[in-house]
Amino acid sequence: MTQQNFVELKNVTKRFGNNTVIDNLELSIPQGHMVTLLGPSGCGKTTVLRLVAGLEKPSAGKIFIDGEDVTDRSIQQRDICMVFQSYALFPHMSLGENIGYGLKMLGQPKAEIRERVKEALELVDLGGFEDRYVDQISGGQQQRVALARALILKPKVLLFDEPLSNLDANLRRSMREKIRELQQQFNITSLYVTHDQSEAFAVSDAVLVMNKGKIMQIGTPQTLYRQPASEFMASFMGDANIFPATLATDYVEIFQYRLPRPANFTTNRQSVTVGVRPEAITLSRNGNISQRCTISHVAYMGPQYEVTVDWQGQTLLLQINATQLQPDVGDNYYLEIHPFGMFILTEKNSG
């Protein structure tokens, strides 16, 4: 256990009967960092959260928190708090009683509990709400209460189990901002589970993508999007157009279309598979024959169009700014691929 890593899973495997849901997983979370687990349904991300919490015991491997082996400890012995999707508030208690319940169970003086409850409510912008009840507040406010209930205990580790999935889009945006703000303010080491990619990107220092119980890639949101390690990652982290390509010293050639070689293409290989994000392809009325394409589908998305084009026997997906172009099906254009949105895939599809 290194000093900078506050939570570590070492060679952790979890089986349910003959089904291996976590396969020899290695995970390190530095002190004060927020790491998000992301992946398709059934990939094992919630099981990892439950293993860290002590709600499940690993079939093999060790779990460390703050340098201590907690593999065999219960959740009560791990100094951990969880924020659940369902909020898990007591309807027969006031909000103040809900938030202060953990302190009450620890035997803290009533006066101290009242003071800390007031402070916690202020933190989540619910000052003066201590005497209200769960059925008197909105879903977004209930999630703030659940967050305050966790923060008041000042845990070593904070776990989030899809906490925003029951909220509408606008509330999700404001709540993820509040969660990130408070997590950074208190420097709490946190593990977050979600199925929402934009949510994962917004709250995380690092994102860990899982599939079939294994880690596919871990990195900053920018790294995962711009430098995916495999075809699975390229597609999972957003739309991607995948092509075979030839690399020369100063250019990349895709179906006879040559463009400048990106500086980060450092491989010595000549034949590679490249990915191009839809926003890195633009359309114009001028170009070479190798760039000529025909629009086959257009979907208006508000600020942008999602456009499908036929090019060199391939079907490409583009995202076009709606203020710059109004494409129609059947129109002919010349496409341009911009190097900033290109990446080399180093592995075949791992999905």
From Swiss-Prot:
Protein known as: Fe(3+) ions import ATP-binding protein FbpC
The reaction(s) this protein catalyses: Fe(3+)(out) + ATP + H2O = Fe(3+)(in) + ADP + phosphate + H(+)
Enzyme nomenclature, EC number: 7.2.2.7
Cellular compartments annotated: Cell inner membrane
PANTHER family documented for this protein: SPERMIDINE/PUTRESCINE IMPORT ATP-BINDING PROTEIN POTA, SPERMIDINE_PUTRESCINE IMPORT ATP-BINDING PROTEIN POTA
Main subcellular location of this protein, as a coarse class: membrane
CDD domains with a match to the protein in the record: ABC_Carb_Solutes_like
Species the sequence originates in: Photorhabdus laumondii subsp. laumondii (strain DSM 15139 / CIP 105565 / TT01)
Topological category with respect to the lipid bilayer: Peripheral membrane protein
Known role: Part of the ABC transporter complex FbpABC involved in Fe(3+) ions import. Responsible for energy coupling to the transport system.
